[in-house]
Structure formats: C-alpha cells, structure tokens
Amino acid sequence: ESYSFALNFAPLAVPILLDRAAIYMETGRTDRAYTDYCRVLDEDKQNKEALLMRAYIYILRRDYPAARIDYNRLLELDPQSYSGRLGLATLEQKEEKFRESLDILNKMIVETPEDATLYVARADVEREMKHEDLALVDLEEAIRLNASLADAYLLRGNIYLMQKKKALAKADFEKAISLGVPLADLHEQLQQC
C-alpha cells in the first residue's frame, strides 16, 4: 500500500513501479504486476527487468509470441543476459522447439559449466525429448555441483517414477521435501511409489 501511496505523488516513478510489481509477483497477483511492468516500459522501453518479467508473465499466460518479442528485445539490449537466455530457452521448450532450447542451454553450459541450474534446465528438455538417460546424466552433474537444488531431485524422481524405479523416486522426492518442497506438492507422486 505504501507503494500505491507513493505513486499518487509520482505516478510514473519507475523504481516504485518495479518494486510494487515484484511484490505483486511474489503474492501471485500477476495481472497487477503485468500492468506495472507495462507502465515501466511505457516510460523506459529499454528497462531490462520489466522486459524480463513481462516476458515471464506472457509465458505464464501462454502468450508465446509476446514473450518472444520481449525476450528478443532484452537480448538485443544485453546479449549475455543470463535470465534472458534462460527464459528464451524455456520459451523454446514450451513451444516444443527442443533443438533450439538445447542450443541455447548448451552454449550457456559451455560458458558457465559450474551452474547446476543449467544442467537441470537441459535435463528437463531432454526428458521431454524422451532422452531420459541423458537427462539423468545432467541431473547427476547438477546434484554434484549443488546438492541442495530441489528441482534436480524433483525431476530425477519423476524420471525414476516413469522408469518404475519406485524406491529411487521415493528417495528423491523425500530429499526434495527436506530441501523445502511442500509435501502436498508431491503427495500424488509419493502415493505412486
């Protein structure tokens, strides 16, 4: 509410709009966040944070063409943007352009081979391509690099479940829960173990 109050005095204050939009995102009010990010971009068409977050909202809405426009604008401004490139790889995956997604992720892994998140992202694409063995190799590497990355255990647990390796799946789901994933989120998977 204090952000809204401040905007009464400076309705186009970009930092205030960005802060309020971030709070809206954290509280699941993406429609309001979207409005604020649009207002920021009306004032500053090159605002990288607003482009990135609006593209993310477009992905949530499944408005992939609009997301692509924002990611491309962001990457024109900052071709090395980690979040922009990872977002574009995610977009390619959502559009089932798996090769394009892998190309982006492979380049990023070459540049930063110690980034566990990139291995998890690539493993997810490989899983969708039905290359579970490659995905498991990437997940092993991700866990080696960062043993507290819950997403790696979640994805590996789901792959194990698909492969009918229920004991391994259960162990990974339990590890993900110990790392902060709510039990309710994994209730269905655990019942299948």
Predicted segments with their positions:
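Terminal, low-structured helical/coil segments at or just beyond the last alpha-helical repeat
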Residues: 161-193
